[in-house]
Amino acid sequence: MMPRIVFIGLLITAATLVGCAGVARDRTQGIALDSQDCCRTVDATPRQTAIVRTATQLIGARTIDVNGRRIAYDCAGVTRAIYLKHGIDLYQGGPSARHANGVRIIHAHIRQQGTFHQGPTVHPGDLVFFDNTWDFNRDGKVNDPLTHVGIVERQDQDGTVIFISRVAGAVERYHMNLALPHVHKTADGRILNDYLRRKGAIDPANTDYLAGELFSQFATRVAQQ
């Protein structure tokens, strides 16, 4: 039986959203992590901790029901459901077109009620956005901004960000290291960057596949007090 998560007390409006399917930014160099603030342990607020706890409870889930209604099972729908559990609707204030990209709806919400940043230090519960994780406009080019979103769980001492998202068949943990964006794993087998884009036979030569290569920006919706 497939794992199923049911959230009680929430309401999701049915909508057809496009985005996050499949596993416009040039990152030829990594981000330097020599700041004293980089990669230090960040104390999360109770609300940030609660958001992360909800996200971890979804790991392995393949369907998510809210008030008996199954929500859109993509990265944006999962991210929205997690925040809705804590009284925040990430779709509020975003474009309402029937076939809107859910990731861009969330991004528009943050422009109004949150803040964007590039790190290097991130907080538990932050959002992380990615570009070009699939050919959204189906033109065969690498020109698809804001195609994926996840929720930061933690940041390790080496700068690797662990985030939770739905990429393939289920909600899972994924890794991203912005200091070494082109490295999948170290010689000793530690994963630094997971693959977020599937390799296709007709991909352009400049196509990237790893999380660090596809990174766009972080966003804070629930700020430190």
Predicted regions and their residues:
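Bacterial N-terminal signal peptides that target proteins for export
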Residues: M1-F7
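Short, flexible active-site loop motifs that bind/organize anionic cofactors or intermediates
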Residues: L10, G68, T115
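C-terminal motif of bacterial Sec signal peptides marking the signal peptidase cleavage site
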Residues: V18-G19
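N-terminal capping segments
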Residues: G22-A97, R111, D208-Q225
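...with weaker cross-activation on analogous glycine-rich loops/strands in unrelated enzymes
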Residues: R40-V42, Y91-R173
